[in-house]
Regions:
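Gly/Pro-enriched, hydrophobic low-complexity segments
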Residues: 66-70, 83, 139-210
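An acidic-aromatic
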Residues: 52-120, 181-186
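Solvent-exposed helix/loop surface patches that form functional interfaces
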Residues: 99-140, 145, 202-213
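Generic detector of low-complexity/intrinsically disordered segments
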Residues: 4-14, 56, 111, 117, ...
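Short, solvent-exposed secondary-structure boundary motifs
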Residues: 35-45, 60-69, 121-134, 143-145, ...
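Short, solvent-exposed coil/turn segments at beta-strand boundaries
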Residues: 22-24, 51-60, 75-82, 146-148, ...
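N-terminal leader/targeting segments and the immediate start of mature chains
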Residues: 2, 8-12, 16-59, 89-94, ...
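A generic structural signal for short, solvent-exposed coil/turn residues
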Residues: 4, 11-13, 21-22, 43, ...
Length: 221
């Protein structure tokens, strides 16, 4: 369950200050994979992950099964409740957010409070809002291979730089790359991106058929 707990810390409300709030009015479904150079594309870290989010307090993260470790991760957040589940053995934890701010966060970049403030605002589901706010003008149009041309939007703060590749016609997100001191830290490749979906309350409800440990409140922020 360790990886699930770490993942939960990434998607649950963070203890660092956030200047902007990502709150899609309609449900968003995003499938991504880690395409960072050096990661084995056949390994578990490179397998697709699916995120659903709605409003500022509901989110769901689905991992692919990791049979070698006996883990099939699922995280469901419906503030103030969060359920961290291992579907492999049907076990889970129920965590209660004590507040005061009951906000679901899904940051794209690793680093938390170490990141410059604007970069902490870059979240799954609100990428184009970030581009519009901080890098509305494309730096260049790049060839992603096979003649696929993409608009490259960039923002730099200190040692950090983020590059967001966007399809020029439909403004769909193709990839996000994070650099520090000129070296690549992470590349997220978008496999699917669906917006404006009808809300499905079941996705953000307590998962059925899971043996949950007693609820544990998170430390107040």
């Amino acid at each position: 369950m360790l990886r699930l707990i770490i993942m939960a810390l990434l998607v649950l409300p963070a203890s660092v200050a956030w200047a902007a709030e990502c709150a899609p009015e309609k449900m968003v479904r995003i499938v991504t994979r880690d395409a960072t150079p050096g990661i084995d594309p056949q390994s578990f870290p490179a397998l697709p992950k699916t995120l659903y989010r709605l409003g500022n307090g509901r989110g769901r993260v689905e991992e692919m099964p990791d049979a070698s470790r006996g883990v099939h991760g699922l995280i469901v957040v419906n503030e103030p409740d969060a359920w961290i589940v291992n579907l492999h053995d049907r076990s889970g934890r129920h965590v209660v957010d004590p507040g005061p701010g009951l906000i679901f966060r899904a940051p794209i970049l690793d680093g938390g409070g170490e990141l410059p403030a604007p970069l902490r605002e870059l979240e799954f589901g609100c990428e184009l809002a970030f581009v519009q706010a901080y890098a509305p003008k494309s730096d260049e149009r790049v060839d992603a291979g096979g003649g696929l041309m993409l608009d490259k939007h960039q923002l730099s703060r200190g040692d950090h730089r983020v590059a967001i590749l966007v399809h020029p016609k439909d403004r769909g997100i193709y990839a996000v790359a994070h650099y520090k001191a000129g070296k690549i830290v992470r590349v997220v490749r978008y496999v699917e991106y669906q917006q404006g979906l009808a809300p499905d309350a079941r996705l953000f409800s307590r998962p059925d058929g899971i043996q949950f440990a007693a609820p544990r409140p998170r430390a107040s922020r």
